[in-house]
Amino acid sequence: MKNLSIIANWKLNGNKNTITNSLINLTTQLTNIPQYIKIAIAPPILYIDMVKNHLTSYNNKTIELCSQNVDIHLSGAFTGDISASMLKDLSVKYVLIGHSERRIYHKENNSLIAQKFSIIKQTELIPILCIGENKEERDSGSTQSICIQQIDSIIKLVGIKAFENTIIAYEPVWAIGSGSSASPRNVQSIHQFIRNYIAQYDKTIANQISIQYGGSITTDNVLEFITQKDIDGVLVGSASLDIRNLIKIINLSSNLIKKTYQ
């Protein structure tokens, strides 16, 4: 059975009170999570240290920290940015890059995202590379070529070996926050295509790499996705803001793993 990763992206949401309450519920209600499930939270960067301190105080060994963004520089006169080395200093393990909202609202292109990927690997953090097509690209049948372009920009800069200990998150832009998810069968076919494409460069990396799905994941559909052969976890956005939903998604995944290993 494959490992599963569940990443909760809280985006620009929450405050000290709501985040603290969410963490209390998470750390007290999540028990006996199998080692094959990896869980991470991506709070607003301002609250990363607070989240870290809470997890430490509860002697948490289950939930890791994820950053929603990173700069391409490690230090310097770059007002408002945060470096990979700073994130590492705060015990962050994962970093999201290439998310469609960063591509759309902050005009981040493949070249910049590749530079972020490079600096994350240099700092020995784990990149979560988000790739996927928008509605127009989907309607024109360009899904595969768009995914190839986004992956190739990384390979061109740092080589295929940099995909070791990396997560790819396929997130069709048209499905994010829309309440309309892609079908599990369609997502499986795209994940299989991504894995096969990477295998053209390195079969070992292709077999080992974790490929998540992100796009209107809910408690009602999560099992339909994670039971697909090439879907190795989920990147959960709006559904994770209700901590009850996030706990249920984790428990559903956990129970599936436990049944598999019984």
From Swiss-Prot:
It is found in: Cytoplasm. The keyword Cell cycle does not apply. The active site is at H99 (electrophile), E171 (proton acceptor). GO terms for biological process: gluconeogenesis; glyceraldehyde-3-phosphate biosynthetic process; glycerol catabolic process; glycolytic process. One of its GO terms (cellular component) is cytosol. Keywords: Cytoplasm, Gluconeogenesis, Glycolysis, Isomerase. It catalyses: D-glyceraldehyde 3-phosphate = dihydroxyacetone phosphate. Pathway: Carbohydrate biosynthesis; gluconeogenesis; Carbohydrate degradation; glycolysis; D-glyceraldehyde 3-phosphate from glycerone phosphate: step 1/1. Its EC number is 5.3.1.1. Disulfide bonds: none annotated. Its main location: cytoplasm. Substrate binds at N9, W10, K11, G177, S216. Pfam families: TIM. InterPro entries: Aldolase_TIM, TIM_sf, TrioseP_Isoase_bac/euk, Triosephosphate_isomerase, Triosephosphate_isomerase_AS. SUPFAM superfamilies: Triosephosphate isomerase (TIM) (SSF51351). CDD domains: TIM. Involved in the gluconeogenesis. Catalyzes stereospecifically the conversion of dihydroxyacetone phosphate (DHAP) to D-glyceraldehyde-3-phosphate (G3P). Belongs to the triosephosphate isomerase family. Homodimer. This is Triosephosphate isomerase. It comes from Blochmanniella floridana.
